[in-house]
Amino acid sequence: MKIKVGINGYGTIGKRVAYAVTKQDDMELIGVTKTKPDFEAYRAKELGIPVYAASEEFLPRFEKAGFEVEGTLNDLLEKVDIIVDATPGGMGEKNKQLYEKAGVKAIFQGGEKAEVAQVSFVAQANYEAALGKDYVRVVSCNTTGLVRTLNAIKDYVDYVYAVMIRRAADPNDIKRGPINAIKPSVTIPSHHGPDVQTVIPINIETSAFVVPTTIMHVHSIMVELKKPLTREDVIDIFENTTRVLLFEKEKGFESTAQLIEFARDLHREWNNLYEIAVWKESINVKGNRLFYIQAVHQESDVIPENIDAIRAMFEIAEKWESIKKTNKSLGILK
């Protein structure tokens, strides 16, 4: 029997999760919600995806456009086993009462506070913690990126300091910036470090800057080691870590632009780069300090986590069975 999945919010994350659900043989996409009949809503309908209004207050927008919806979010909740909340940050907490009333499990995204869910989740780090849970939060794109690589070396970690160089907006976002400035997060630590600690118990401090780019985040990471680790050890660990890929400047990967072009060359949907990209040349060990630089595709790295979280919540697969299944279905390289 397939798990019936609904998506509340069919935007950057929602449409990617919806696509990923359709690639699973143990899940069924029942429908998605929209607040207005925009091009994404029309595209969903063209793909045969049932579209629902996010609430009754949005119905007039669809009626005015002659766009026929299947009902509202409440109607969708009656048909699903789980809802993936991909609404803007803060909305998930407000929506939770609807999910509770409907008796439906829910997955929230990283824009929500950790308290909204029973567990914060990154599949390879704490899959077991989500087993049987009703409410799970998939952490943000940046936090997912940090956890993927730091979890792989956590037995060696004494203290982490990471600088987050964040993209200003997603490619289709015309409302955010800056477009001609570098904007620091003047509160130290930034929220990313404490967010990592909701998944793995390590000592970490982070600072963050927003820069005028749309395609990826970059992290510069320094790790103080509590036991010896060589550069070759780290390379070997990362090469054997799922959803982490090593890229070399020598082979033309000089910036995030080439990383996204690589995803395009793979013919990935929306040029998704689900894997965290680590520059091999940046991996260096000086004394008891490890340095490396990684890039995160903010639109897609959390997508496989949503799929794995669904399986964990319904306890239909063990950790590595789910991860391997998700990886294969999405064409994740390792």
Curated annotation (Swiss-Prot):
GO cellular component, one term: cytoplasm
Subcellular location: Cytoplasm; Encapsulin nanocompartment
Amino-acid biosynthesis found in the keyword field: no
Regulation: Insensitive to pentalenolactone, an inhibitor of bacterial and eukaryotic GAPDH. Activity in vitro is significantly stabilized by potassium citrate.
Presence of the UniProt keyword Hydrolase in the record: no
Recorded superkingdom: Archaea
Pfam families reported for this sequence: DapB_N, Gp_dh_C
Entries under InterPro entries matching the protein: DapB_N, GlycerAld/Erythrose_P_DH, GlycerAld_3-P_DH_AS, GlycerAld_3-P_DH_cat, GlycerAld_3-P_DH_NAD(P)-bd, Glyceraldehyde-3-P_DH_2_arc, NAD(P)-bd_dom_sf
Chief site of localization: cytoplasm
Pathway named in the protein's UniProt entry: Carbohydrate degradation; glycolysis; pyruvate from D-glyceraldehyde 3-phosphate: step 1/5
Catalytic activity: D-glyceraldehyde 3-phosphate + phosphate + NADP(+) = (2R)-3-phospho-glyceroyl phosphate + NADPH + H(+); D-glyceraldehyde 3-phosphate + phosphate + NAD(+) = (2R)-3-phospho-glyceroyl phosphate + NADH + H(+)
Keywords attached to this entry: Cytoplasm, Encapsulin nanocompartment, Glycolysis, NAD, NADP, Oxidoreductase
Transmembrane domains' residue ranges: none
Thermal characteristics: Thermostable. Has a 44-minute half-life at 100 degrees Celsius.
Quaternary organization: Homotetramer.
Family: Belongs to the glyceraldehyde-3-phosphate dehydrogenase family.
Name the record gives this protein: Glyceraldehyde-3-phosphate dehydrogenase
Gene that this sequence comes from: gap
